[in-house]
Amino acid sequence: MSEILHRLPEFIGNHLVLSVLFAGVLVALIGNEFSRLFRGYRELTPAALTQLINRESPLLVDLSAAADFEKAHIPGARNVQLSQFDPENKDLAPVKERPVAVYCRAGTTSAQAAARLVKAGFKQVFWLGGGLAAWREANLPVAKGR
């Protein structure tokens, strides 16, 4: 091991571009992990969301378009369009202490909504990674209609 440490400065000197790229990627990975840890909401898998639903009865918010919601959604979810999603709404104020899980079709726009909920003071915010597509891929039940 000490042989490697003694030759490390020589390697870095001979491969400066490679070493700088490695350091940049390492810093980016560490920064990404720190931001993930401190963002205030947790990403859930479909199995973890199922456990949350069974144990704590969270408020499920589906951010899909109304037509997509009618085609398929997680049973018990409420449909709210992202353009109409307002965490400061007086109807949501009573559930600030209750768990809230958000999802959309693919899981991209719901992450933005989760961040808005945390900013508004919600304590337990969850986001379904992969969205409804991941839920369906896990062969979990979906409801149709309103």
Where are the regions that the model predicts?
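Rhodanese-like catalytic fold shared by cysteine-dependent sulfurtransferases
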Residues: 2-43, 47, 52, 66-99, ...
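Structural scaffold elements adjacent to functional motifs in cytosolic proteins
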Residues: 60-62
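Metallo-beta-lactamase
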Residues: 103-104
